């Protein structure tokens, strides 16, 4: 059998990228970039930085859940929401034609060798074929305009850094390389939800790794 499988929608069997995986990776990259101390134990023995300081770039953006400080528990709600990423219709159509026994995916056989005895330890992993496209959405809640530019710049910078890193397991073995394309930025003011104002849309079609002007382009959406 397959030792490591992808996560799928139980109704359609289509693979998807959990928003928690992408958000967690971006948080980790920002923690490393800002040289934060990993002082808070998380699940599976993983440590991360967590505090309730509203000036902390990491926790202000990604949130802090029930961090215990001085005997009190406080929450710092995340300003950013990362939704699950699903296959685009075009990629879905291509992957439906893939032959190999697994719907929409492939399996890769790897082999570990004992450095002393040279005994083989074969394993099989499931992965989405290279070139598959996923559509994802990130929602940023504007709580303070004075930190808006800084927060969005951090998100864009971490997505650019992710292109030189990897998403998911096995990154050092060729898995998880991604590229990002910003399709558009949308601003919905309070009056939009009251039916009094239209949303503002800016078409982007640009990659974070090759566009230093992107923060300005994205922030232009919020110019009233």
Outline where the language-model segments fall.
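RNA-binding basic/glycine-rich loop and surface signature characteristic of RAMP-family CRISPR effectors
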Residues: 1-224
């Amino acid at each position: 059998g397959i030792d490591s499988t992808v996560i799928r929608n139980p109704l359609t069997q289509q693979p998807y990228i959990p928003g928690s995986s992408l958000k967690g990776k971006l948080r980790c990259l920002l923690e490393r970039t800002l040289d934060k101390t990993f002082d808070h134990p998380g699940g599976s023995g993983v440590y991360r930085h967590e505090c309730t300081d509203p000036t902390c770039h990491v926790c202000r953006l990604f949130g802090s859940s029930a961090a215990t400080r001085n005997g009190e528990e406080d929450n710092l709600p995340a300003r950013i929401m990362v939704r699950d990423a699903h296959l685009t219709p075009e990629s879905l159509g291509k992957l439906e034609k893939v032959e190999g026994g697994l719907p929409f995916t492939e399996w890769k056989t790897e082999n570990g060798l004992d450095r002393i005895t040279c005994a083989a330890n074969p394993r099989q992993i499931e992965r989405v074929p290279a070139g598959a496209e996923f559509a994802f959405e990130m929602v940023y809640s504007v709580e303070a305009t004075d930190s808006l530019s800084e927060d969005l710049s951090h998100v864009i910078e971490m997505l650019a850094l992710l292109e030189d890193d990897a998403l998911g397991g096995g990154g050092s073995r060729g898995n998880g390389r991604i590229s990002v394309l910003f399709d558009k930025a949308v601003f919905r003011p309070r009056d939009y939800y009251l039916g009094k104002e239209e949303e503002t849309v800016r078409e982007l079609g640009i990659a974070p790794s090759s566009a230093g002007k992107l923060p300005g382009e994205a922030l232009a959406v919020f110019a009233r």
